[in-house]
Amino acid sequence: MKNRSSSPPLHVHVDENTPVHVHIKKGQKTTPAKCQQKHKQKMKGNTVNVRRAVQVKTKAPWMPPGKTSVLDSTYKWEGPTHLLEITPPESEKMMSVLRLSDLSTDEEDAVCCKMNEYERKIDSLMNVVGTLKNEAKLQKQEQRQQMTKRLLEEQKEELNEVTQELAESEHENTLLRRNIERMREEKDLTMLQKKYLQHEKECLLSKLSEAERDGAAAAREIHALKSTIERLNVEKHMSSSDINMLTRQKELLLQKLSTFEETNRTLRELLREQHERERDVQKILEKQGVLMKMLADSDAEKLQLQMRLQDKEKEINNLAVQIQEEKEQARTASELSKSLESVRGHLQAQLRHKEAENNRLTTQIRNLERSEAQHKAEVECIKDQLKELRQKADRDKDALKRALRAQKERAERSEECAGQLAVQLAEKDSYVAEALSTLESWRSRYNKVVKDKSDLELEMVTVNSRIADLLEQQATLEDKMREDRDALMDKLHQQTTETTSFRMENERLKASVVPMEEKLNQAHVEVQQLKSSVRNYEDLIETYKSQVLKTRMEAADVAAKLEKCDNEKKALKDEMNKELELARKQFQSQLAELEKLPEILRITETQLAECQDQLQSYEKKNMDLSVMIADLRQRIELQGDKMEMTRERYQSAQEEKKQLTLKAEELERKLETTSTQNIEFLQVIAKREESIHQCQLRLEEKTRECSSLARQLEMAIEDAKREVEQTRERATSRERAAQSKVLDLETQLSRTKTELNQLRRNKEDAERRYESRLQDLKDRLEQSESTNRSMQNYVQFLKSSYANVFADSALLGSPGRSRSSP
């Protein structure tokens, strides 16, 4: 019994409206302080919401439970250490009443606070997601603006290149015009030179014919001298006529030889000059061919530039059409984006509403779980009561052994308690069944909500896919968008006026200033390269100019040489005339001397011997001259061949000149067409230069604004970087905290699920044990009833036996009395 008296405290789960009064007996070892400590520990562990009234009682004689006052309609149960007194709700007397509504709601408040915190976190996360989406949109807009700026800069560069190419083409056209004028002048010079060459060739031919004639005359004179000398050798007697003939022939020979030598010298000089002129002409022709190639190349380049200009104009027109189309597409895209944002806001509102409903359902489910936990605690209390009932049954058995009356009373009390407990168990079972039905209904509602949530998620996925498709379409449209320069400037003005997006705009401008500076540096490098190329072209032009000057100097030298040749020819003609006059004078003087022949014959006779000696020497000289004449004939033949070659070359040169004249005419026509086209291009270029000048002025203004904004950008970027770092740190900390909380919640959910499963299993095991114990109690009650019946039968037997005995004794005593009485 002592071991039984040190049993654990009692747990009782009661309805909200039933007041509870508990009496606790003082054991040998328990104290009120210890009971209070146990009560506090139980209150902290959320076990039972029952207030105990601790009363220290003195030991009183045991009173049977059946003899209590009838007025008190309370249910009492007394054990070795506790006394349970339950008053129904109808009774007006309430001692230490406790209701469940008076219990603490700290847990519910904490759960509500946690739910509010989670809702706030979800709202903050949604706001962060919205800010991130806005940042992504702004980044996309910045990328679009950067792409448009790049495209505009590329178009500007292309326009600058085209203007530079046009300037170069104009410069080349001017150079070509100058070259063509020079070619015309050179053509005039070449015509004069050809006439002069023809005159020189005629002079050479006349000189050659004269040289041939002089050679033939010299040969005749030599042949006549040979015949006279042979005749004189045969006759060996010279007359005065023979002497005169010899002297005449001698003089004629000398004259012919002198003229032949002079003509040979002049021919050699003329041939040398002719060779030099031919070389100069070949050089000039080569230079003309080079110039013609340059002209052809320049014409081809002009045609290419014209084609490029036409292509550029077509591209500009196409770009203008595309820009208009892209503007329309941008408008449609903006309308679509607005509609998408409205749909998105509607969906977000629906999601928030569904999340709020889910949170409400989760709170209701948690409340149901709490009620289940309370029911489990009540079941545990009932189990404890069953344990105590078992103990009580054991005690009742012991009491039955001691006394039949106490056993009967306790049996009746146990029957009453069992009935009450059975009623309570039935009520609890019905309450548990109702709770399970409510749980199933809540689960069905929760499943419906989960299904609705999954449907909404699917709808969100479809909407997101549609949004992604629309974003892709918008991206394609944005890739195609190439806005004009004025539109960009207007956008820049509008974006500068926007105060809300000032920081993002500053970052965008900072990001756009860096590639602009890089492009400016590239443009400066390209300008330097173009300047170097222009310098190279200028050097080439100077070289061409120097070559042209050289050719002009050479032509002037050739003209001077030709003038010198003309002067020399005139001088030679004058000298020839003078020599002829001198020869005439000599012949006249000789004729005058021949009149004095008889005086001279004597002298001639003396001179004949000398003449014979001289003849021998002349014969030797004649042999040498014949050899020289053969060489001269060969040379003349070679010169004739060369003259034929020169004639053929002259004819080919004339044909080439004709072709060149035709080409020059074609070039003049092309120049006229190109001049008209250049005038048109100049007009177009002037208009474009005006527009470019205006754009440059705007760009300068914008560069100034950008420089002023860049300074502000640096400060704003630093602040933005700090804020971004702080926000990133906060976001990372929030994400970590959220992840940790999510993990904790998941672990708590898993724990609660495992606990629920364990509690369900324990509940099932407890129900099985309870049923088995109820069956045992029923069996024991039947046994106790059978023992009671047997005891009653035994008592009746004893009564009957005692009655019989006492009746027999009474019968036996009655006759003795009767006998003594008389």
Swiss-Prot record:
InterPro entries: Odf2-rel. The keyword DNA repair does not apply. The keyword Glycoprotein does not apply. GO terms for biological process: cell differentiation; regulation of cilium assembly; spermatogenesis. GO terms for cellular component: centriole; centrosome; cytoplasm; microtubule; sperm flagellum; spindle pole. Residues 26-45 are annotated as: Disordered. It is found in: Cytoplasm, Cytoskeleton, Microtubule organizing center, Centrosome; Cell projection, Cilium; Cytoplasm, Cytoskeleton, Microtubule organizing center, Centrosome, Centriole; Cytoplasm, Cytoskeleton, Spindle pole. It comes from the Eukaryota. Keywords: Cell projection, Cilium, Coiled coil, Cytoplasm, Cytoskeleton, Developmental protein, Differentiation, Flagellum, Microtubule, Spermatogenesis. Residues 113-418, 452-490, 516-796 form a coiled coil. Its main location: cytoplasm. Self-associates. Associates with microtubules and forms a fibrillar structure partially linked to the microtubule network. Belongs to the ODF2 family. Seems to be a major component of sperm tail outer dense fibers (ODF). ODFs are filamentous structures located on the outside of the axoneme in the midpiece and principal piece of the mammalian sperm tail and may help to maintain the passive elastic structures and elastic recoil of the sperm tail. PANTHER family: OUTER DENSE FIBER OF SPERM TAILS 2 (PTHR23162), OUTER DENSE FIBER PROTEIN 2 (PTHR23162:SF8). This is Outer dense fiber protein 2. The lineage of its organism: Eukaryota, Metazoa, Chordata, Craniata, Vertebrata. The gene is ODF2.
